[in-house]
């Protein structure tokens, strides 16, 4: 009798073990990312996601999204967040901060309740879309509803959606406050309050809104703040609104180890020529090019297209639906280059970006840090190139000193090992659309301009502005602008505008 019970118990244990192994084998796992990684994400304690004792359904979403092991910020944050304690976390850009708060937030959601149980605030609309998509992807087996709400979209649509159960609300502060003030978004039983890019959200323009939003939450809420930089204003918020927060600081150095930084002294009128040279010499998978103003963004995007390179652009003055489309298409590899303002400096995660170019050098170290952090995501390699004029030399020195980093003069030839991967096809597709194939391919650097134009565009070299898309791709009418003649910031007249963008030279 005892032997029979022992055999039955042994068979049951083996069956459970086999079942434990089988559930992972049945997952729709993405191809393994074979690119090397730096210690920014590999210097861990050796924990596995299973060590956090989270729901199997959540682990299924984690593994199917391509996550393999937790990064340092995830190791430090997830176990503490699961206890409900307030957290103040500081870590480098691109090291896994989003998953560090999304995973414990998802774990604590009760899908049987119809109440909103978590509010995640971010400073920009693009980051709100990206964060909500991460929540949906990781939590796709949990049976929960995630809603994103931002300014620039119809308020009535949000009101209709909030009539149904919304477990996690992701949005920008102004729109969420509007919904809460109208009694549409009920946060009275919402125990989790998360702020990503908290330094931006606690700037003077947002702080009053944040404090009003907190008043709609229960007093025993959990508050979690995440950012790469924490100014003094964060300490003031912590002392006023957080209860004995667990503080995490993984910023032993400020810049990502995988990003190589260079500068080139260039006269203003030679910047476009220098950019053209970089395009012809570098092996770019995808690049983001930053300008300091929206006017320069549009002018530069047009000039890049005239040089024969595919190009999108995005800035804050565009309609939200157009910004969303540009962001979506660029993430999915429709276009190789994106020119933008500082709209996309925070949190935007596009794994395929291996080159960031500061066409206009930023004015402060914080902006510089966030800009270059768009490459080298999650411990991978990247390149940051800064085009410096004579007036920028003091900012260059100041930023080097404040960040404790070295920005080197650009060499004649840049070693491809610093930013190029042996197998670029192994770069993960966007988490928001893992099934959509990439549409860009590598163009040889020595290809002629005409060949590049044919390679990058299916439109036989016609480069009218694609209305409403923020891209110069050869379709549609131009965006109408002021008809009066004005002088652009490159020192040249923009001319008359009548439905097409100006053909004035950028340099």
From Swiss-Prot:
Annotated Helicase C-terminal domain residues: 258-418
Gene3D superfamilies hit by this protein: P-loop containing nucleotide triphosphate hydrolases
Binding site residues for ATP: 91-98
Cellular component, GO annotation: P-body
The protein's role, per its UniProt record: ATP-dependent RNA helicase involved in mRNA turnover, and more specifically in mRNA decapping. Is involved in G1/S DNA-damage checkpoint recovery, probably through the regulation of the translational status of a subset of mRNAs. May also have a role in translation and mRNA nuclear export.
Record text about domains: The Q motif is unique to and characteristic of the DEAD box family of RNA helicases and controls ATP binding and hydrolysis.
Domain of life (superkingdom): Eukaryota
UniProt-listed Enzyme Commission number(s): 3.6.4.13
Protein name: ATP-dependent RNA helicase dhh1
Reactions catalysed according to its record: ATP + H2O = ADP + phosphate + H(+)
Broad class of the protein's primary localization: cytoplasm
GO biological process: mRNA processing; mRNA transport; regulation of translation
Motif (Q motif): 47-75
Record carries keyword ATP-binding: yes
Ranges spanned by the short sequence motif DEAD box, renumbered to the chain: 196-199
Intracellular or extracellular location(s): Cytoplasm, P-body
EC category: hydrolase
Compositionally biased intervals (Polar residues): 7-16, 432-449, 495-507
């Amino acid at each position: 009798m005892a032997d029979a019970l022992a055999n039955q118990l042994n068979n049951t244990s083996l069956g459970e073990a086999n079942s434990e192994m089988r559930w992972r084998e049945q997952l729709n796992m993405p191809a393994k990312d074979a690119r090397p990684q730096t210690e920014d994400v590999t210097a861990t304690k050796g924990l596995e996601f299973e060590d956090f004792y989270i729901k199997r359904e959540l682990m299924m979403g984690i593994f199917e999204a391509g996550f393999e092991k937790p990064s340092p910020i995830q190791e430090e944050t997830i176990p503490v967040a699961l206890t409900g304690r307030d957290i103040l976390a500081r870590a480098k850009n691109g090291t896994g901060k989003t998953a560090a708060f999304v995973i414990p937030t998802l774990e604590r959601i009760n899908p049987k309740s119809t109440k909103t149980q978590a509010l995640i605030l971010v400073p920009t609309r693009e980051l709100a879309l990206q964060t909500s998509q991460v929540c949906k992807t990781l939590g796709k087996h949990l049976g929960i509803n995630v809603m994103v709400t931002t300014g620039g979209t119809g308020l009535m649509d949000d009101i209709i959606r909030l009539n149904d159960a919304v477990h996690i609300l992701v949005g920008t502060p102004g729109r969420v406050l509007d919904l809460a003030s109208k009694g549409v978004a009920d946060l009275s039983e919402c125990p989790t309050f998360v702020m990503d890019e908290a330094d931006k959200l606690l700037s003077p323009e947002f702080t009053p809104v944040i404090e009003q939003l907190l008043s709609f939450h229960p007093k025993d809420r959990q508050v979690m703040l995440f950012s790469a930089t924490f100014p003094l204003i964060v300490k003031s918020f912590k002392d006023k609104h957080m209860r004995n927060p667990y503080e995490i600081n993984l910023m032993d150095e400020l810049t990502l180890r995988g990003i190589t930084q260079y500068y080139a002294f260039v006269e203003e009128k030679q910047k476009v020529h220098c950019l053209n040279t970089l395009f012809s010499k570098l092996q770019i998978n995808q690049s983001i090019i930053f300008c300091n103003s929206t006017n320069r963004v549009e002018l530069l995007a047009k000039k890049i297209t005239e040089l024969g390179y595919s190009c999108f652009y995005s800035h804050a003055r565009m309609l939200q639906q157009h910004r969303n489309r540009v962001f979506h298409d660029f993430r999915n590899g429709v276009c190789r280059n994106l020119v933008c303002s500082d709209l996309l400096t925070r949190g935007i995660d596009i794994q395929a970006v291996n080159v960031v170019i500061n066409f206009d050098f930023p004015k402060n170290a914080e902006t510089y840090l966030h800009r270059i952090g768009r490459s080298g995501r999650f411990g991978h390699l990247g390149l940051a190139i800064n085009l410096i004029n004579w007036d920028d030399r003091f900012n260059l020195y100041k930023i080097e000193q404040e960040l404790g980093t070295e920005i080197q003069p650009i060499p004649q030839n840049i070693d491809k090992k610093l930013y190029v991967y042996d197998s670029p096809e192994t770069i993960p597709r966007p988490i928001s659309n893992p099934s959509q194939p990439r549409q860009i391919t590598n163009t040889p650097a020595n290809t002629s301009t005409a060949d590049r134009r044919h390679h990058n565009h299916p439109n036989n070299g016609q480069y009218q502005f694609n209305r409403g898309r923020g891209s110069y791709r050869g379709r549609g009418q131009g965006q109408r602008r002021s008809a009066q003649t004005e002088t652009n910031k490159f020192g040249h007249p923009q001319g008359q505008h009548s439905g097409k963008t100006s053909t004035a030279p950028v340099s």
